[in-house]
């Protein structure tokens, strides 16, 4: 079952840590966001394979936007 990784806040994408096809564990950092001059790691809530990365460095994302999909 696929697990969507979504943004919880409005932020810009500072770094994309994973690539499509990567095996990740629950708690691994998926992306680093920047909001109000703070770096905020977005963590995987499930282990699996990254099947889609929906953001790029520099993107401005809104709360609820899709960041990645873990299968």
Swiss-Prot record:
InterPro entries: Biotin_Carboxyl_Carrier/Decarb, Biotin_lipoyl, Single_hybrid_motif. Residues 2-71 form the Biotinyl-binding domain. It comes from Mycobacterium tuberculosis (strain ATCC 25618 / H37Rv). The modification N6-biotinyllysine is found at residue 37. This is Biotinylated protein TB7.3. It comes from the Bacteria. Gene3D superfamilies: 2.40.50.100. SUPFAM superfamilies: Single hybrid motif. Disulfide bonds: none annotated. It holds the Pfam family Biotin_lipoyl. Keywords: Biotin.
């Amino acid at each position: 079952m696929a697990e969507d990784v979504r943004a919880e806040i409005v932020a810009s994408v500072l770094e994309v840590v994973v690539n499509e096809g990567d095996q990740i564990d629950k708690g691994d950092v998926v992306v680093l966001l920047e909001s109000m001059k703070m770096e905020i790691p977005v963590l995987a809530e499930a282990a699996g394979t990254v099947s889609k990365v929906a953001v790029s460095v520099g993107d401005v994302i809104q709360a609820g936007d899709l960041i990645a999909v873990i299968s």
